[in-house]
Amino acid sequence: MDIIKYDVYRGPNIGIFTSVNDKFVFVPNGFAKTKAENLAHYLQTEYLMTPVANTRLLGILMVLNNHGILLPRTSSPEEITNLRKCTDLNVKILDTKYNALGNLISVNDKGGIVSPIIEKEYVKEIEDVL
């Protein structure tokens, strides 16, 4: 695996603004198209520009793997529709009181870990979507 150094909005905090699986790199609306293309080329993915909860904070707010995407309840219907239309992934809202799902849930295609502050009733839903 090759690793490159890459900045987002001229800052070091790449995980705040982007999210990646094997097929897509998700970047915020307004992200420079050439930077998105270069990033997608390097990662050998497609890029998709989208807001999450009408913000640029994709990495903080969304959690995904190659099966699905979980979004906070503050996400708009248009965002959900667009992600469903542009990907072949299962896209769902996790209706918990917490919105920083990317900070509270970490998954790959084989398993995951969930913060203890996530209510137990949501664990099965997380398993089903992802």
Language-model segment annotations:
Residues M1-L130:
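The feature marks the mature, well-folded catalytic cores of soluble enzymes
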